[in-house]
Structure formats: structure tokens, C-alpha cells
Amino acid sequence: MTVYNDIIEKLKRKKIHMTLIDPASQDIESSGRIAEAAERAGTDFIMIGGSTRINSELMDKTIGAIKSKTSLKTIIFPGSPEMISPRADAIYYMSLMNSRNIDFIIGHQVKTSLFLRQLAIETIPMAYLIFEPGMTVGRVGEANLIKRDDSDTALLYALAAETFGMKLVYLESGSGSPTYVSENVIKKIKEYVKIPVIVGGGIRDKNAAEKLAAAGADIIVTGTIVERSRNVYEALQEIISSI
């Protein structure tokens, strides 16, 4: 079964939680331990990426460490073309649709298309939308930030993504964001869009996760919390049980 089909099958039964591990935020062995704790807590998939300062060697070693500790499928969340590894189960073939820089919309994707085909890694087409405050990813990605409660603009982007044939749409507030995407934005998108909606950024506790899931988010992503928590299992288990 492909990773994407696995996602769709799981969504028929429940909401999904994904743990984002940034290889640049801790040593390789710690990445493996985080993944192990996340699996015990009930996370469904491991995303690897986030930073732009990651090369393919670090990705290879990090994914290897994660796979040695967990049976969960791994998905690359690329911040640059250098973050491709054949060891992952899949990669988000993502377009930062509200960027001012064409490289983030389609340029990097064109440059890596042949390489990805040669690797025979599963690609999952995904629209990536960055909302205020955006944090580092908004700055680096040169995003025209969508206001966190601007449901009309968000809906138009999401509809365009679905019309393009994207299989997922990711609503991002930015790693370490003090706020998360408004529930009203998610509700509006879910009224019209049939592809799964991922929400990440600013989700620090079960209350936030519960609200976003109730609003219609299909997939909840948490990353900063696993980097900062002394007990990854407890921190994630509380969030995962709430969705």
C-alpha cells in the first residue's frame, strides 16, 4: 500500500496525527528516540524536515535512525531540493502557493522531478499555504501571508489546489508560532474541498488540537513540542488522545 493510500484508509476510521522531526534540531540518535516515543504515544506517520540547513547525508542518517527505532512510515517534508533521501517512504511534492518566489511555487519542483522519478520514491502532491505570523518559514519562503482568520482567501487557494489535482492541502502558521490557523478557516475550506486538510504550527496542547480537529482538520502535525519536551511520550499522548 502506498503512503498516500495508507493516509486515506486511516482517515476513514479516525483523525491522523503526524510527528515532525527536524534533523537539524537534535543529534541523529535523539531523532530516533523521538520517533520511538512518538510511535508509543500513537502518532501515525513521521515527517522529516522543516529546516533549510539540511543536506541529503543528514537526511539519510536521520531516516535510518528513525527506521531503526520505529515501524512507522516516513515522509520527507522538504525545505530545499537537497533534502531528498531514497530511504524515506514518500516525499511531499509540495508547492508553496502563496510565495512571491516562483522557485517555491514550481522552480524547485521542476529541478528535482527527474531525480525523484529515478529514485522511484513515492511523491504526494501537496499545496502548502502559510498563514500569519508565518515565522521563519514565512520569511524564508517569501510568503504573502494569509491572515489567520481570512477564510475567503484561504478557501480560494485550497480550491485552486484541489483543481490542480493536489492530493493534500497543508495550512501552516509556522514552527513555534504563538497562534494556529483559525477554526473558521478550516470549517470554510471543509465546506467545499474534498482533499484532506493538514494543519500545523502553534499546536502546543490538547485544547488546540481538539479545537482544530473538531473544526474539520483531518491531520494534525506537531513538531516544536517534541523538540522542547522532556517527556515526548506524555506530551504527544495527551495531544493525540484529544483528536
Curated annotation (Swiss-Prot):
Cofactors, names only: Mg(2+)
Entries under CDD domains matching the protein: PcrB_like
Signal peptide (from-to): none
GO cellular component: cytoplasm
Subcellular location: Cytoplasm
Keywords, ordered alphabetically: Cytoplasm, Lipid biosynthesis, Lipid metabolism, Magnesium, Metal-binding, Phospholipid biosynthesis, Phospholipid metabolism, Transferase
EC number from the UniProt entry: 2.5.1.41
Catalytic activities: sn-glycerol 1-phosphate + (2E,6E,10E)-geranylgeranyl diphosphate = sn-3-O-(geranylgeranyl)glycerol 1-phosphate + diphosphate
A Gene Ontology molecular function term of the record: phosphoglycerol geranylgeranyltransferase activity
Binding site residues for sn-glycerol 1-phosphate: 170-176, 201-202, 223-224
Superkingdom to which the source organism belongs: Archaea
A GO biological-process term: glycerophospholipid biosynthetic process
InterPro entries: GGGP/HepGP_synthase_I, GGGP/HepGP_synthase_sf, GGGP_HepGP_synthase, GGGP_synth
The protein's annotated pathway: Membrane lipid metabolism; glycerophospholipid metabolism
Lipid metabolism found in the keyword field: yes
Binding positions for Mg(2+) per the UniProt entry: 22, 51
Main function: Prenyltransferase that catalyzes the transfer of the geranylgeranyl moiety of geranylgeranyl diphosphate (GGPP) to the C3 hydroxyl of sn-glycerol-1-phosphate (G1P). This reaction is the first ether-bond-formation step in the biosynthesis of archaeal membrane lipids.
HAMAP family: GGGP_HepGP_synthase
Family: Belongs to the GGGP/HepGP synthase family. Group II subfamily.
Protein name per Swiss-Prot or TrEMBL: Geranylgeranylglyceryl phosphate synthase
